[in-house]
UniProtKB/Swiss-Prot annotation:
Superkingdom of the organism of origin: Bacteria
Protein species of origin: Campylobacter jejuni subsp. jejuni serotype O:6 (strain 81116 / NCTC 11828)
Binding site for substrate: N11, N60, G70, N71, N164, E182, R183, G193, T194
Protein name, as recorded: Diaminopimelate epimerase
Catalytic residue list: C69, C192
SUPFAM superfamilies: Diaminopimelate epimerase-like
Subunit structure: Homodimer.
Cellular compartment(s): Cytoplasm
UniProt-annotated site: Could be important to modulate the pK values of the two catalytic cysteine residues, residues: H138, E182
Pfam family, any one: DAP_epimerase
Gene Ontology biological process terms from the UniProt entry: lysine biosynthetic process via diaminopimelate
Amino acid sequence: MKFYKYCASGNDFVITNADRKEDRSALAKELCNRYEGIGADGFIVILPHEKYDFEWEFYNNDGSRAAMCGNGSRAAAHFVHHINKINPNMSFLTGAGVIKAKVNQDKVEVSLGKIKSVQNTFEELGKTWQLCNTGVPHLVHFCQNLDEFDTMLCQKMRQKYNANVNFVKILDENHLKVRTYERGVEDETLACGTGMGACFYLAFLNKKVQNKVKITPKSGEEVGFAYKNEELFFEGKVKYCFEANYNFS
């Protein structure tokens, strides 16, 4: 199997082309293993589609399926344009719906579409939370110090609510910093696109930031978010790392 390794804002992905759908959960887990495989946060399979430019299957690091991944969508768009030679303005089908993307050299902007749902704030484990679905569910906690981020606490919240967990600090009305515990990876990751999107949207909804901001995840790779016409837009750089062939175990 020929594969391509990509990075986007700190998240890394293994991407490959395929001509049909099938259960690749075991393969995803094998490929994403950082000790015995290639190592990645997620595995993306690009499939043909009659109506859209392509369809994808997205697998988490543990082999579970995910409806959506923000950074993964940008990596997939970069791959399909630069490797598969598809038009830079594209649309593709995910488990969370249709995603629109624009590729400009190493920068990719995607529309994550409309926010799926937002719940009221609630208190748990000594902190205030809000749940927002940007394609996948995210718990968000606004804090003054990102050192408050606690992996064990995040694990408890993730298990109870079956959601990703984010801590966000507002630096000013145009800049946020975010740390995310991702389900499917079951640990903190260097970045999470849908998580940053949830943090931005809730901050905007609560009138704490403007409708266009910069966000710095743990990786330090700054990305841009905007909310316009009831859609969430996400832009940042994507890096092609390498390509190789993988022999199945």
